[in-house]
């Protein structure tokens, strides 16, 4: 897409310094061997874009050779994902805790392992968009409901 594409759906940063920090952090970690930004060759220009008074970060996908690379398990406030190849039998132990996991597999035993894992907050089995919101999910619905436990209290007068 282009900077002036009316169909683009990226949110700008309220604080441009945050976009600068994220962009710099990704670039700094890309200096370490064992990682490649696979989306760079498809972009026209830099990851960080300043236009029409807004600061934006374009989607970024990196391929890491191992989980030892600092970008292999990072989260940023922008469209970012890392890809690390690992044997399926080692995957749950290697990935650690995750807010969202999408598994595109027909292996029913592996699906059962994923369902049983306490490390995964939200599990998508199949090609489900992570942009699809389900308000009945704890981290997508009312945050008050998620953060605070309801309980009834009675007090003697």
State where each predicted segment sits.
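Flexible, acidic loop-helix segments that line cofactor/substrate-binding pockets
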Residues: 1-28, 38-52, 74-75
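Structural alpha-beta junctions
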Residues: 1-2, 31-33, 117-124
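Structured helix-beta-strand junction loops
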Residues: 28-33, 97-98
């Amino acid at each position: 897409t282009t900077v002036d594409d009316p169909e683009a759906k990226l949110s700008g940063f309220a604080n441009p310094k945050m976009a600068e920090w994220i962009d710099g952090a990704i670039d700094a970690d890309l200096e370490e061997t064992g990682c490649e930004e696979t989306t760079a060759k498809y972009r026209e220009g830099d990851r960080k874009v300043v236009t029409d008074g807004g600061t934006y970060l374009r989607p970024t996908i990196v391929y890491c050779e191992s989980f030892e690379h600092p970008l292999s398990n990072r989260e940023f406030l922008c469209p970012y994902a890392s890809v690390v190849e690992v044997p399926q039998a080692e995957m749950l132990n290697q990935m650690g805790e995750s807010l969202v996991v999408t598994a595109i597999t027909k292996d029913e035993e592996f699906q059962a392992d994923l369902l049983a894992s306490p490390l995964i907050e939200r599990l998508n089995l199949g090609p489900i968009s992570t942009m699809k919101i389900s308000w009945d999910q704890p981290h997508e619905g009312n945050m008050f409901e998620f953060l605070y436990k309801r309980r009834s209290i009675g007090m003697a007068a």
